[in-house]
Each structure stands twice: as C-alpha cells, then as structure tokens.
Amino acid sequence: MWRLKVGEGKGKDPYLFSSNNFVGRQTWEFDPKAGTREERTAVEEARRSFFDNRSRVKPSSDLLWKMQFLKEAKFEQVIPPVKIDGGEAITYEKATNALRRGVAFLSALQASDGHWPGEFTGPLCMLPPLVFCLYITGHLEEVFDAEHRKEMLRYIYCHQNEDGGWGFHIESKSIMFTTTLNYICLRILGVGPDGGLENACKRARQWILSHGGVIYIPCWGKVWLSVLGIYDWSGVNPMPPEIWLLPYFLPIHLGKAFSYTRITYMPISYLYGKKFVGQITPLIMQLREELHLQPYEEINWNKARHLCAKEDKYYPHPLVQDLIWDALHTFVEPLLASWPINKLVRKKALQVAMKHIHYEDENSHYITIGCIEKNLCMLACWIDNPDGNHFKKHLSRIPDMMWVAEDGMKMQCFGSQLWMTGFAVQALLASDPRDETYDVLRRAHDYIKKSQVRDNPSGDFKSMYRHISKGGWTLSDRDHGWQVSDCTAEAAKCCMLLSTMPTDITGEKINLEQLYDSVNLMLSLQSENGGFTAWEPVRAYKWMELMNPTDLFANAMTEREYTECTSAVLQALVIFNQLYPDHRTKEITKSIEKAVQFIESKQLRDGSWYGSWGICFTYGTWFALCGLAAIGKTYNNCLSMRDGVHFLLNIQNEDGGWGESYMSCPEQRYIPLEGNRSNVVQTAWAMMALIHAGQAKRDLIPLHSAAKFIITSQLENGDFPQQELLGASMSTCMLHYSTYKDIFPPWALAEYRKAAFIHHADL
C-alpha cells in the first residue's frame, strides 16, 4: 500500500537539505506489507469507483491519505447524520451538529506537524515532462519503480477523454499539447503503439493525426519534442539565451517578466542555445513515424514554427510577435550560432542562464517555483553536468512533487500545505472551538510559525531579478521559499487571531518582529493603483503581453494585481491596525484606502468580481465582499456591496446552492454548471460572502436555503462530496485543491450559525 509520510528527509540523503528540518514535507512511499486485507480492499474499491465514475466526477476525492490518517487518528464519527426533510426548518441544534461533524472530520485530517495535506494538481501537462527528463537522463527506472509506473499509467488512463485525447486539465476538452505529451509518456512507460487500457495509445494517436499531427503542438510542446528528437529545433521560435545579456533597463528584458514565465524561459533558453537533443533511440524513431503525417525528413520546419492547433490556441499571436520571431529565426539566430560569435557571446549567455537556474534551484531547495520549471531546470542541470550535485539535488526533491490518490500517481504543481492550513484554522476559529479542537489549533499555529520565510533570497537577489521574501509565507512550506501576498495575508491573519487567545490553548504568540516583517512584505507588493500583486511588484509594461509566446495562457508576461490578493492583504492589515495601531500607521491606513478603491474599481457591471485563482466570479466576489466588509463597508453605505449581493442572489440555484463552470474563467463571463447543478464549496463561498455583507439582517431565506443544501450534502463520516474543480490560474489552467471540500463547507456553516441564530432560536 501507498503511505503518505510527513516531515521525513533528515539524514537520509546527502543531496537533500532543508531550512526548516523538513517541516511540512509530504512524500509517498510504497510498502508492500502495509495495510490489512480490509484496508487494501477499500483502496481497490476506491480505485474501481473512481474509474467507473470518471466521466461524471473528474477530480479525485483524495481518499488514500484520508483513509490512512483517519485510521491513525482512530477517527469515529460519533455525531449522528443530520436529516432535514422537505420544508423542515433548520434548528440551532441541527446546524451545530452538522458543523461539529464537519469539524471533527477536518480535525482528524491534520498531519502530525500541524498542516493539512491534500492534492494540488489538475493540469495534465506536468507528469509527462518529468518522465521525458528521466528518460533522457537515464534515471527513469532508478527514480520510479514498477509500483510508481503502475500508478502513473492508472492516472493517465483515468483522465483520457472519450475521444482519445487529453485535456489541458482534467475537466477540459482534448488539446494537442497534452494529448501528445501523454501519448509519448505512455510509450516511454512501455505501452505499445496500439496498446494500453481500452486501446489508449491507438485512440490517442488517431486524435493527434486527425488534428494535423504533432507539428500543431504549441510552443512548449515543440520544445519538449525537440529535446526528445521527435521534432526539430529549426521548427521552434527562437528563445536565444543572449536575452539574459541585454541591459536590464530595456523594457523587453525577461528579468522584468512574470516570475513563472521568467523562470520557465531560463532553462528553455539554455536548451535552445545548446540545441540539445537526447539520444535517438529506436523508440524515438518509432515515435517520429507514429506522430507525423509525412516522413520526418520532408517536414517544412520553418512553416511548422507558427502552427498551433485551434483547440490549443487561447492567445493567438499578434502579427507583430510573429514578425519578431521570423526576424530572430532568419537573421539573428544564424548570426549568434555562427563562429566566432558562438564561442564568445553564446558561451557567455549559456553561462549566465545556468547561473540563474542554479540560483533559483538553490533558493527553493530544488523544489523550484513550480513543477513545469523544475522539469526544465533539472534537465538543464544534467546537460550542464550529468554527474554534478545540482542534478542530484533535483532528483532528491522529485518525491516532494508526487502525489498518489485513487486515480493514480500524478505530479503536483508543488504543495499547498500553508494555504490549506490558513483556511482550516479560520474555519475552526469560526466554529467556536472547544476542548477537542484546542490541540488542533496549537499544532496548526506551530506549523504556521515555523513555515514563515525568515530571510531574503541569498546574495545580491535584486541582480537575480528577485524580490524580498523575508516575512512572507509560501503556498506550501518554508523550503519552497517563494513568498505570496495572499498566503502571507492568510497566515498573518491566523497568527494575529490566535494571539488574542490564551497561550495555553494556542501556544506561544508569534514574535512581533516577524509580524512586522510580514507587513513590510505585503506593503511592498502594492501597486500605485492600490491593488496587490501575488509574488513580486509589477516591473514590466502591459504591452509586453503582445510577446506572450505560450499560445495556451493569457496574462503570462507580466505580474499584475489581483482582487483576491488585494482583499486578503486588506483584511490582514485591518486586523493588524486594530492590534498594533502604532506601527507604520499612516502607511497602513493609506494602503487600506487604496486597496478599497482598487477592489471597487474592479467590480464588473453585473456586480461581480473576476476571480483569478478560483472559479470564478463566485470566488472573486466572495473575496471582494469580505474585503470591503472588513473595512466597515455595508449593504447600506456601499453601492459595490449592494451590487455584489444582488449578483450572488441572482445566480442562486433553486436547491439553495451555487454552481459555476470553469468555463467562466477563459470566457470571462459567468457560466453556470450544466443543468444548474450546485457545488458545495462554491455554495460555501457565496454563503460567506452574503453573511459578511449583512444578508442575515435583511433576509435569511437565501442563507437558510444554502445551509440546507450544505447540510443535506454532508456524507456519513462528516465529509462532503467531491465535485468539480475549484482552482484556477492564468485563465485556462484549472487546479484541483482536494482539501477545499473539507474546509469551506464547515466554515460556512460556522458563519451561518453565528449569523442566523444570534439568540439560539429555532427558525
């Protein structure tokens, strides 16, 4: 059986190091002797059930670690299920029992070091490049044994669409990018060209060829196929490493770009500058024949540079971008690659690119900012020195990126430990914690305190295009190292709220200087327009988006301000101002005022706010209304609050819930779930937004209906059902936060109970 291990790594591997004694580290290990017959049967049943229902519910319920943790906690749900029939009223007792059931279940899922684990996946483009990298470097069987490979195959099979392709993420329609990557991954893992479960490879290849063959794969796919030797580098738009030698004052310098894009193109520029191609094995030769519609030697690679399948093209290249690519390809790259310039300029450029790669790797303990970047950086390190320590350190951190659930083994974006813990703590605090949750809060508080980033990136970090990180919190753990404004805000909120409680309940308060550092970091991420960015201040002009080469994403070139980040920081600063009114008072007051103006300015005509990190208008409106409420805005004194409330009430479903499709994100307009289905987590978001906007004082019926939907959705063990994806990124990339369903419904019930039963009266 697979077992989730927490906080392990000390002394086991000379290439593994930590800034925090591996607190929060999550790794999976296969133990052939683990588990009773009943437990193994339960795991197999979970796998069978997922596969049989995979067309109806795409995300996993993340059952494997939950079964393990519930057993280790000796969890038994002793509070009976709450039944509410037809028009029956909700009583205080029933609301309390449903809440306590959810809190008990959530508490039992806490890890020993205080965090809440959970799957953080969704995109189907993450696992294959890892397999490609290990195949090219000759380490595939060393890193992944037969059990790993079996679960990887399970994951790929589980998420193949009926048409034979794979979507950009697990709920999307098939696209060339992920269909090609997963097809090649299956072949590398040993599946024959017509083999696989339900003829997976044959069906996938038919999809690829019927859509023009792999010359229509978007640019990132072209890079990986060129590295493998299935595509030619002359068919890739140039990304010369000399870009890193340009003066930083130039507005087009990639050092000013969005952090994820910048770090993605560091190794891509290195690979391009080297024109690296792995060993041409018999399998690669077969793939050349299988995936192209014409003989490999006859392909017009120059023409293929601009090709992209219509299914993949979310951001079509403007004409000016294609003209620039053509100029680079026709004139600049041949010059840079010629002697003696290649010995002088290119050699220096490759050294600079590798210097930046090593810097990012070291400062993230080789987790890297995300998995897309890790795979590319790891390969670049191997090319630079196959026997070097940098590559070996990358190998040691691969387990941190892997996750196992009933749908198989997948590669995570990275972890979401801190993000989940911050929300879980707020849910527990809202529930009026009792004796049985005090230890849970104490452990969570300890995890949050230990996970704060205590230093800035090493050395002259500004010359490496990095921002301060001291005082911040990451999405996952301290070792990751990448500060995020909303993660910092949620963690700081928890620390401040817990500091108001007795230390014998919640443990020692966080050091005040650490809170000051977190405030300093948050303030540094506010733009002139009042909004807060996520990772770094805005450095590039918006017109740089004209050079977005990804095809797949929008808003990929520049950092920008987000409603959710702005609201989270606003709420944290309001609490800080109340507790510590003498620290940077004028700056914080001005910051809050500007943040409010930004949130109000981002409201759309229908009263909603676009959510960049969740789906979508429901998520954004929840954050916006909570932020405005934190500063004292009400339905009566704020038009934005009124319009936001009306938007949510107008989209409430007949069953009392809310349900929004992920298509709202790319379409940038509200789209309900098919059949007007409701989603229990989105219902919780909308419900909390209305409560913070004072809905209980005006009309309780919408809240009662929502609460009834949540309560009647609760499962026997106190958990809630897994439904649609809930996370989002860059408009098209949907994310699976599996622990959301364990946190937000109880949190909403806690807020509902306080708002609806002020005097503990029945409805």
Curated annotation (Swiss-Prot):
One Pfam family matching this protein: SQHop_cyclase_C
Catalytic center residues: 486 (proton donor)
InterPro entries: SQ_cyclase_C, SQ_cyclase_N, Squalene_cyclase, Terpene_synthase_CS, Terpenoid_cyclase/PrenylTrfase
SUPFAM superfamilies: Terpenoid cyclases/Protein prenyltransferases
Gene Ontology cellular component terms for the protein in this record: lipid droplet
Described function: Multifunctional enzyme that converts oxidosqualene to tirucalla-7,21-diene-3beta-ol and two other triterpene monoalcohols.
Keyword presence, DNA damage: no
Protein name in the entry: Lupeol synthase 5
Catalytic activity, EC: 5.4.99.-
Mapped PFTB repeat ranges: 149-190, 515-556, 592-632, 641-682, 703-744
GO biological process: triterpenoid biosynthetic process
Entry's Gene Ontology molecular function annotations: oxidosqualene cyclase activity
Recorded name of the encoding gene: LUP5
Homology family: Belongs to the terpene cyclase/mutase family.
This protein's UniProt keywords: Isomerase, Repeat
